[in-house]
Amino acid sequence: MTKRLAIGAVAVLLALGLGLAWLALSSRSELPDGLPGGVVFVSDRDGSPALYFRRLPNEPERRLTFGSEAVGEPRVSPDGSRVAFAMNGRIGVVTLASGEMSVLTLGVDWKDTQPDWLPDGRRLVVAARRRVGEPASLHLVEPAPDGSVARRPLTQARGGDDQSPAASPDGAWVAFVREDRLMRVDLDGGRLTRLTGGFKRDRSPRFLGRERLVCAWSEGKKHGIDAIDLATRARQTLTEGGVFYRTLAPSPDGRFLAVTRSWDSGVPPFAGLLGAPKEEVRLLDASGHERGRLFASRRHANHSPDWGR
């Protein structure tokens, strides 16, 4: 009995030692030089999820939104001066320089989420639903100088949500996700076109320059990120494996991706007992290789990055 207890204790200590060594190695992160712009992200480090901003490469992080109400899904305006975000069915906007916040849509007639700016920096496309439980469609919202907001439906959802809108660089159309496929809708005329098919379940489309889309995907137990040529619809796999990336955002110069890394099937099973990180923001290069952690914690989640100038 004593011998079995001793062997068990040694096994536990060995597992703990291996776990601590793995965590120490996995927490090392040296970011590459020359990272452009700044990143807005969501963190619950101070309680409710709030927006934070960090000018890269090494300025201190700064909180942008305050209060007990959870906010999320930030999108930086084309000129880098403002951030649109979702807040309990409403769309808010915060100015980066001053922290001044305004509410764009009130969440009364429509519950809005997932804002994305058009290139003019004035209009936004959002995922909107009448009430909780109904499918979301895409709407174009246009603020007026008098404070009113015009709204025009772009899509009519079928069974599930039309979600994750991404406006094209020329402002002529919007990419989005419908039933795990990438779609496009033209702002002028509303013509719908399917962009992807096959077995991959796509999510989080973003434009990588004017000629490509980049998106995360899952297929069975595999997950990855693909770049899609808009002219030929050819897919190039940037990364594939057991790491689940929930969202992604290209840098302004297209050399990097800021991604929400949700989990990794290759993480040792004992890591969770030792305080493995929660959802975190990682840096990938344009080839899909991880280059380091941007925002990570073993106590608080960090996620949903968007890159500004």
Label every model-predicted segment.
Residues 2-309:
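Sequence signature of WD/YWTD-type beta-propeller architectures
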